[in-house]
């Protein structure tokens, strides 16, 4: 995904306010060299930020005709206006592993027998996960297959099938948090149990 930005020479609260009033958003690029102050078209940035891939993909940032690979690292929003106050990008080194969070996409939830027949309600405890990998291996998202999770079970971080070249960060491996749970609500009864209860008693 390509992002076009322009060099920014002025900084400070007053300069940033004037920039935003002119339809621009201030930002910075850091890492692997000198920090670079930039400005971006606010409307284009606002629409880009609505895309999931913008937050979890390697971006091609063009500044003054020169391109560099970056990751979006931070966005500051106005508390009640549709306004981006500031955006941070980090340069990416193709030979160095990066740590970042990627979204989880949950698959086959609707067809899961625990939901259809077992009365379970699948709960997403975590919707993104922190990984480490080389930039070339960075996935836009990671799929979590819920087809086989059973009623009353939980799926943990280390249960997720990761793409080649991708690993969980060390603290997630150690903590192994719950990603998804499939509890049966109190008082709920599975279709199978209900069917058993409806059978006439043997004479």
From Swiss-Prot:
Keywords (A to Z) from UniProt: Ribonucleoprotein, Ribosomal protein, RNA-binding, rRNA-binding
What pairs make up the disulfide bonds?
none
Q: Name one GO cellular component term.
A: cytosolic large ribosomal subunit
Per the record, the domain of life is: Bacteria
Gene3D superfamilies, alphabetically?
Ribosomal protein L25, beta domain, Ribosomal Protein L25, Chain P
- InterPro entries per UniProt: Rbsml_bL25/Gln-tRNA_synth_N (IPR020056), Ribosomal_bL25/Gln-tRNA_synth (IPR011035), Ribosomal_bL25_b-dom (IPR020057), Ribosomal_bL25_C (IPR037121), Ribosomal_bL25_long (IPR001021), Ribosomal_L25_dom (IPR029751), Ribosomal_uL5_bac-type (IPR020930)
Q: Which GO terms describe its molecular function?
A: 5S rRNA binding; structural constituent of ribosome
- What GO terms describe the biological role, i.e. biological process, of this protein? translation
Spell out the Pfam families in the cross-references.
Answer: Ribosomal_L25p, Ribosomal_TL5_C
Q: How does this polypeptide assemble, per the annotation? A: Part of the 50S ribosomal subunit; part of the 5S rRNA/L5/L18/L25 subcomplex. Contacts the 5S rRNA. Binds to the 5S rRNA independently of L5 and L18.
Family affiliation: Belongs to the bacterial ribosomal protein bL25 family. CTC subfamily.
What is this protein's function?
Answer: This is one of the proteins that binds to the 5S RNA in the ribosome where it forms part of the central protuberance.
Identify the PANTHER family for this entry.
RIBOSOMAL PROTEIN L25/GLN-TRNA SYNTHETASE, ANTI-CODON-BINDING DOMAIN-CONTAINING PROTEIN, RIBOSOMAL PROTEIN L25_GLN-TRNA SYNTHETASE, ANTI-CODON-BINDING DOMAIN-CONTAINING PROTEIN
Q: What is this protein called?
A: Large ribosomal subunit protein bL25
Organism per entry? Paraburkholderia phymatum (strain DSM 17167 / CIP 108236 / LMG 21445 / STM815) (Burkholderia phymatum)
